[in-house]
Swiss-Prot record:
Name of protein: Small ribosomal subunit protein uS2
Pro residues composition-biased segments: 288-298
UniProt keyword Cell membrane present: no
Subunit structure: Component of the small ribosomal subunit. Mature ribosomes consist of a small (40S) and a large (60S) subunit. The 40S subunit contains about 33 different proteins and 1 molecule of RNA (18S). The 60S subunit contains about 49 different proteins and 3 molecules of RNA (25S, 5.8S and 5S). Interacts with ribosomal protein S21.
Annotated localization: Cytoplasm
Compositional bias per record (Low complexity), positions renumbered to this chain: 270-287
One annotated Gene Ontology cellular component of this protein: cytosolic small ribosomal subunit
Phylogenetic lineage: Eukaryota, Viridiplantae, Streptophyta, Embryophyta, Tracheophyta
GO terms under biological process: cytoplasmic translation; ribosomal small subunit assembly
């Protein structure tokens, strides 16, 4: 009887952790915690390094990922699930997760009262809330607790577990770690729904869930932009000879479009003999008579008498 119970509780072989998945989690630093440890996170700690960093047990992380995927699949309408991240490193992963699973994504700052104030236009009553960091997303956690909304969150070693129903122990501060976790969770959800066969590889790369710098994204968009083609497309390409020379028919058809050359201006011969002198009156050495005076008519004003002030 106990054997049958254990077999029923064990996950399917296709969904069990594989070496490639564990290596990917290790490469993304999912197992690295912080130097502080919350008392409710001690059960998920594997050991502590010499520099004080706590190491998270990835076996516990995989079990919690499967539990979270089962809860997500149990909800009939995916739009009743809200995936939210106020941390910049998790915003792209949240959008990609919502794209492939059909959930509703909120990337950025949480508007207070979204889950409690019915007068707001953005008011919603989700059936499940998935968060990236309980410390950064403390406001939606408190509002979800007031509305009896179950909460799933990625919890680091120093994350508070208050009002968190399912805490997935993992590194929630690295951009590669957050993207890897959401990629694994999305793949598990699609496998449990039957969208992806468990034995086959998912064709979506994990790199799509990683955070990208704005400058890097802008540079890639500029490189992928289509270049403008200014080439001539209406010429007769078949008329070009094999040696690359234009035949005479094309020269005749384009003869009207070729502008005529400008006639040359005859040059001046400075060595020619001097011409005949100019006509009379053109000698500059001749004396010029003085100009004639023009008489001024009288104005009719008498001569001003002396005033004695001179």
């Amino acid at each position: 009887m106990a054997t049958a119970t254990n077999a029923a509780a064990a996950p399917p072989r296709q969904l069990s952790q594989k070496e490639a998945d564990i290596q990917m989690m290790l490469a993304a630093d999912v197992h690295l915690g912080t130097k502080n440890c919350d008392f409710q996170m001690e059960r998920y700690i594997f050991k502590r390094r010499n520099d004080g960093i706590y190491i998270i047990n990835l076996g516990k992380t995989w079990e919690k990922l499967q539990l979270a995927a089962r809860v997500i699949v149990a909800i009939e309408n995916p739009q009743d699930i809200i995936v939210q991240s106020a941390r910049p490193y998790g915003q792209r992963a949240v959008l990609k997760f919502a794209q492939y699973t059909g959930a509703h994504a909120i990337a950025g700052r949480h508007t207070p009262g979204t889950f409690t104030n019915q007068l707001q236009t953005s008011f919603s009553e989700p059936r499940l809330l998935i968060l990236t960091d309980p410390r950064t997303d403390h406001q939606p956690i408190k509002e979800a607790a007031l509305g009896n909304i179950p909460t799933i969150a990625f919890c680091d070693t120093d994350s508070p577990m208050r009002y968190v129903d399912i805490g997935i122990p993992a590194n929630n501060k690295g951009k590669h770690s957050i993207g890897c976790l959401f990629w694994l969770l999305a793949r598990m959800v699609l496998q449990m729904r039957g969208t992806i066969r468990p034995g086959l590889k998912w064709d979506v790369m994990v790199d799509l869930f990683f955070y990208r710098e704005p400058e890097e994204a802008k540079q890639q968009e500029e490189e992928e932009a289509p270049a403008v083609d200014y080439a001539i497309t209406d010429f007769n390409a078949g008329a070009i000879a094999a040696d690359g020379q234009w035949p005479g028919t094309i020269d005749q058809s384009w003869s009207d479009a070729v502008p005529q050359p400008i006639p040359a201006v005859p040059g001046v011969n400075w060595g020619a003999p001097a011409e005949a002198p100019a006509a009379a009156g053109g000698d500059w050495g001749e004396a010029v008579p003085p100009p004639q005076q023009i008489p001024v008519p009288p104005s009719g004003i008498d001569t001003v008498q002396p005033s004695g002030w001179d």
